[in-house]
Regions:
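Active-site beta->alpha loop and helix N-cap motifs at the rims of alpha/beta catalytic domains
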Residues: 2-156
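Catalytic alpha/beta core domains of metabolic enzymes, predominantly
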Residues: 137-142, 149-204
Length: 204
């Protein structure tokens, strides 16, 4: 089954609803379980999800080779067949593999990519500088999601840091907020959007 050549639509700040974070099915021998992948996608679509997010932290992307990542994305996109947007985790140990994966999945029909900060970042300025490099790596035409999940990354992104990233990143159209407690952070970000200090984004 071949995935569509272009996404049905690129991700944008109007995205809303349930973007389910999927697992990556494996066989008992540790290989990708593509039959189970198809069943998983069918179940998600039948349940009415607005979109899918694959190869995230819960999707165990770090356990896959580059070849396996491409194969899994191709399988999911082929099964979805443009019915909902699919966001692909593109976090990588370096910018070259991030660029390669992003270019590949966008060509296959992904709606955008998701990026989390690496655990090596220690200061606010390092975090902001890293995402400036993300912007340069992905380019202006690839919509991307900022993943804020300090429990797994070990990187605490404060509200001012996130706002700096958003101000510097016109292609960042969504925040995947997984910090806890996080109500104050979300309230401050929403207030900044309302005041026009940053461009509107979708928050999931």
């Amino acid at each position: 089954m071949q995935p569509p050549k272009q996404p049905m639509n690129k991700l944008d700040a109007s995205a809303q609803g349930v973007y389910l974070i999927t697992v990556t099915p494996f066989t008992d021998s540790g290989d990708l379980d593509l039959a189970s992948t198809d069943r998983m996608v069918d179940f998600c679509l039948d349940s009415g999800v607005a979109g899918l997010t694959i190869l995230g932290i819960m999707g165990e992307a770090t356990k896959l080779t580059a070849q396996e990542s491409h194969l899994f994305v191709k399988q999911v996109l082929g099964r979805v067949a443009g019915r909902v947007p699919v966001v692909v985790g593109a976090s990588a140990p370096g910018f070259a593999p991030m660029r390669e994966l992003t270019q590949s999945v966008m060509a296959m029909g992904a709606a955008g990519v998701m990026v989390a900060p690496p655990s090596t970042l220690r200061t606010d300025d390092q975090i902001v500088a890293y995402f400036e490099m993300v912007n340069e790596t992905l380019g202006p035409d690839v919509p991307w999601v900022l993943q804020d999940h300090p429990v797994s990354t070990g990187v605490q992104m404060s509200t001012p840091v996130i706002l700096r990233i958003l101000m510097n990143s016109p292609a960042c159209v969504m925040l995947k907020h997984e910090d806890c407690p996080g109500l104050a952070k979300l309230s401050a970000i929403c207030a900044a959007i309302k005041q026009g200090n940053v461009m509107p984004i979708s928050i999931l």
